[in-house]
From Swiss-Prot:
Its EC number is 3.5.3.4. The gene is alc. One of its GO terms (biological process) is allantoin catabolic process. Keywords: Hydrolase, Purine metabolism. The keyword Hydrolase applies. InterPro entries: Allantoicase (IPR005164), Allantoicase_dom (IPR015908), Galactose-bd-like_sf (IPR008979). One of its GO terms (molecular function) is allantoicase activity. Belongs to the allantoicase family. This is Probable allantoicase. It is an enzyme of class 3 (hydrolase). It catalyses: allantoate + H2O = (S)-ureidoglycolate + urea. It comes from Acinetobacter baumannii (strain ACICU). It comes from the Bacteria. Pathway: Nitrogen metabolism; (S)-allantoin degradation; (S)-ureidoglycolate from allantoate (aminidohydrolase route): step 1/1.
Length: 336
C-alpha cells in the first residue's frame, strides 16, 4: 500500500513571520460542519502536510487526508466553522487541495467573526474571501486586507468536495487579563515569531517556538556544517514584551550535532520594523551569556539570566552551528 507525500511547497516570504491561527497544535478546532461524510473536517487543521495512501478505504469510501463532504444531490453548499487556536488579525489564507483531483470544490469563500466567549448566536460574520474558483491538487494563497481581530472562521465550499488543509496566517492577539501570570512569552501560541536567521538548511527556526517537545531531529532549528569562522543566529519577536524569569534550551534528538554553546541577546524596542532589527541585533546586550550545551537535554537557567526590565526581541546565537529543538522564555507580561 504505497503512500504519496505532498510536494514541497515554499510559503511566500511575506508569510514566513506569520502564525497559522488555525493550527490544531495551538488549539484550533472544528465547532460545526454541514457534512464530513467521507473525511473528518478536523483533518484539514493538522500541521503535517497531507498524504495519499493508495488502496486505503474505510466504511465510507476512499480515505482522504483532509475534509471531504459527500456529493450534493440538491441545491446548496457545504460549510465548516472553526474556532481559531488563538484570536488574531488575519493576513492570508492557504486553501490547499493537494491530492483532491476529481473531488475538489469548484470554489470557496471564507468568513470570520469575533466571539471571545465562544457564543456564535447572532454574531456578525465578515467576508474576508469572496467566492473564488479553486483548482485540483494545489495550494491557493489569498492575501487578506482586514485589521479586525477574529476568533472564528467559516469556510464555505461550493457545492461540495474536499480540502486537504486550511491555513489561516496572521498575527496573534493576546488579551491580557493577569500581569502576574507566568507565560512562555516566546511560544507560538502566545504570538512569538521568527524575524530573520543566518541559516536553516536542515530545520527552520520557527520550530523553536512550536508547542511541546520536538518529535524528532527534523522538528527543530538546524544549520549546515560551518566551514568558516563565525556562528549561526536567529532573531525572534516575543508575543508580548515582558521580564524574563526562566530560560529553557532543549536539544531533544540532537546528539551528534548539538551546538558547543548557546547565548541569547535581548532588547526592548517599541514600533521597530523587522528590517531595522537585523543589523542592530549584534549590539544587543546579553540576556544569557554563552552556556555549554549537552546532547538531547533540557537546559534550564534562572540565576544565569542577566537583568533586563523588559524584553521585546531576542537573538539566539548557536556557536558555532548545529541544532536545537526548543527555546522557552518564561516570564510576566510587562505593564504598559
Amino acid at each position: 500500500m504505497a503512500t504519496l507525500h505532498a510536494p514541497a511547497f515554499e510559503l511566500p516570504e511575506i508569510l514566513n513571520t506569520k502564525t497559522n491561527l488555525a493550527d490544531a497544535r495551538i488549539g484550533a478546532q472544528v465547532i460545526e460542519c454541514s457534512d464530513d461524510f467521507f473525511a473528518e473536517a478536523k483533518r484539514m487543521l493538522q500541521f503535517e502536510a497531507p498524504i495519499f495512501v493508495e488502496d486505503k478505504f474505510d466504511d465510507h469510501g476512499k480515505w482522504m487526508d483532509g475534509w471531504e463532504s459527500r456529493r450534493k444531490r440538491h441545491a446548496g453548499y457545504d460549510w465548516c466553522i472553526v474556532k481559531l487556536g488563538v484570536s488574531g488579525k488575519i493576513s492570508a489564507l492557504d486553501i490547499d487541495t493537494t491530492f483532491f483531483t476529481g473531488n475538489y470544490p469548484a470554489s470557496a469563500s471564507l468568513e470570520a467573526c469575533y466571539a471571545p466567549n465562544g457564543d456564535l448566536t447572532g454574531v456578525t460574520w465578515q467576508s474576508i474571501l469572496e467566492n473564488t474558483e479553486l483548482g485540483p491538487s494545489q495550494h491557493h494563497i489569498f492575501m487578506v486586507n482586514n485589521d479586525a481581530i477574529f476568533t472564528h472562521i467559516r469556510l464555505n465550499i461550493f457545492p461540495d468536495g474536499g480540502i486537504a488543509r486550511l491555513r489561516v496566517y496572521g498575527d496573534v492577539h493576546i488579551q491580557v487579563t493577569d500581569h502576574e501570570q507566568t507565560l512562555d512569552l516566546l511560544a507560538l501560541e502566545n504570538g512569538g515569531r521568527v524575524i530573520a536567521y543566518s541559516d536553516a538548511h536542515f530545520g527552520h527556526p520557527r520550530n523553536l517556538i512550536n508547542p511541546g517537545r520536538g518529535v524528532n531531529m527534523g522538528d527543530g532549528w538546524e544549520t549546515k556544517r560551518r566551514r568558516a569562522p563565525g556562528y549561526d543566529w536567529c532573531i525572534l519577536a516575543l508575543g508580548k514584551s515582558g521580564k524574563i524569569e526562566k530560560i529553557e534550551i532543549d536539544t531533544a534528538h540532537f546528539k551528534g550535532n548539538f551546538p558547543a554553546e548557546v547565548s541569547i541577546q535581548a532588547v526592548y524596542l517599541e514600533n521597530a520594523t523587522d528590517a531595522q532589527l537585523i543589523p542592530q541585533s549584534m549590539f544587543w546586550s546579553y540576556l544569557l551569556e554563552a552556556q555549554p550545551m549537552q546532547m538531547d537535554h533540557i537546559h534550564e537557567y534562572m540565576n544565569e539570566i542577566l537583568q533586563h526590565e523588559k524584553v521585546s526581541h531576542i537573538r539566539i546565537n548557536m556557536i558555532p552551528d548545529g541544532g536545537i529543538s526548543r527555546v522557552r522564555l518564561w516570564g510576566k507580561i510587562a505593564k504598559s
